[in-house]
Amino acid sequence: MDPVPGTDSAPLAGLAWSSASAPPPRGFSAISCTVEGAPASFGKSFAQKSGYFLCLSSLGSLENPQENVVADIQIVVDKSPLPLGFSPVCDPMDSKASVSKKKRMCVKLLPLGATDTAVFDVRLSGKTKTVPGYLRIGDMGGFAIWCKKAKAPRPVPKPRGLSRDMQGLSLDAASQPSKGGLLERTASRLGSRASTLRRNDSIYEASSLYGISAMDGVPFTLHPRFEGKSCSPLAFSAFGDLTIKSLADIEEEYNYGFVVEKTAAARLPPSVS
């Protein structure tokens, strides 16, 4: 019988035997009756009146891919070796307890991320009863044991907790401060820094005829010892006695007639005898 399509329920994480006179192990639920409604107590006899219930435990979380799930169930003869990869189902409170003298139940546990199919449910019935949609494993203790297999769900990655630094980078509007508040705090920080600067600092002196400095608007200043000579104030006093000359004044002052050159060029070269 092929596995049925996956269901919304979680796969089984384990099976265990529990004495009928005691509560099931923590995290397990007991199969107390068959599909027909008859009591489902194993091993009940004159020597052992309480008997045992088969208990199931479902996988609680899909976040851990290494969490084991029940991949298969088999019924084997008590004295025969267990199939490869299988382990016996036992009573957690009494590992030596014997449920059946002839047979024993064993399960194959695999990590959730390493199996394609898993067991999702187990039911008990009389030997002549058929349970639709379930695969018959075998007979034990006067009952027919059925299991329902389905496609194993894929592990769900566990969400990571964001640190405060990462939350600061989040685009979630609910966790971000308002734009107006952010601008106000930024302006406040820049204002407090700019208030420590003085207009007579060399970086704010006029470095051109327009009085605009490359440092205007920069919210920090260099330490004086890192300022070079090029940052010193410009001495405009050197231009105080500047005389503006006309074209005629320049031609008169720098007029040169080239008389010597012309005289030398006019001389005849000496004759060669």
From Swiss-Prot:
It is a peripheral membrane protein. It comes from Homo sapiens. Residues 192-273 are annotated as: Interaction with TSG101, VPS37B and VPS28. The modification Phosphothreonine is found at T130. A motif (SH3-binding) lies at residues 155-160. Phosphorylated on Tyr-204 upon EGF stimulation. Phosphorylation is required for interaction with CD2AP and CIN85/SH3KBP1. Pfam families: DUF2464. Keywords: Cytoplasm, Cytoskeleton, Endosome, Membrane, Nucleus, Phosphoprotein, Protein transport, SH3-binding, Transport. Residues 215-265 form the UMA domain. GO terms for cellular component: centrosome; cytosol; endosome membrane; ESCRT I complex; extracellular exosome; intracellular membrane-bounded organelle; late endosome membrane; nucleus. Its main location: cytoplasm. The modification Phosphoserine is found at S163, S170, S195, S202, S207, S232. One of its GO terms (biological process) is viral budding via host ESCRT complex. The modification Phosphotyrosine is found at Y204. InterPro entries: MABP (IPR023341), MVB12A (IPR040335), MVB12A/B (IPR018798), UMA (IPR023340). Component of the ESCRT-I complex, a regulator of vesicular trafficking process. Required for the sorting of endocytic ubiquitinated cargos into multivesicular bodies. May be involved in the ligand-mediated internalization and down-regulation of EGF receptor. It is found in: Cytoplasm; Nucleus; Endosome; Cytoplasm, Cytoskeleton, Microtubule organizing center, Centrosome. Residues 9-151 form the MABP domain. The gene is MVB12A. This is Multivesicular body subunit 12A. Ubiquitously expressed except in skeletal muscle. One of its GO terms (molecular function) is SH3 domain binding. Component of the ESCRT-I complex (endosomal sorting complex required for transport I) which consists of TSG101, VPS28, a VPS37 protein (VPS37A to -D) and MVB12A or MVB12B in a 1:1:1:1 stoichiometry. Interacts with CD2AP and CIN85/SH3KBP1. Interacts with CD2AP (via one of the SH3 domains). Interacts with TSG101; the association appears to be mediated by the TSG101-VPS37 binary subcomplex. Interacts with VPS28. Interacts with VPS37B; the association appears to be mediated by the TSG101-VPS37 binary subcomplex. PANTHER family: MULTIVESICULAR BODY SUBUNIT 12A. Belongs to the MVB12 family. Changing Y204D: Mimics constitutively phosphorylated form and has the ability to interact with CD2AP and CIN85/SH3KBP1 without EGF treatment.
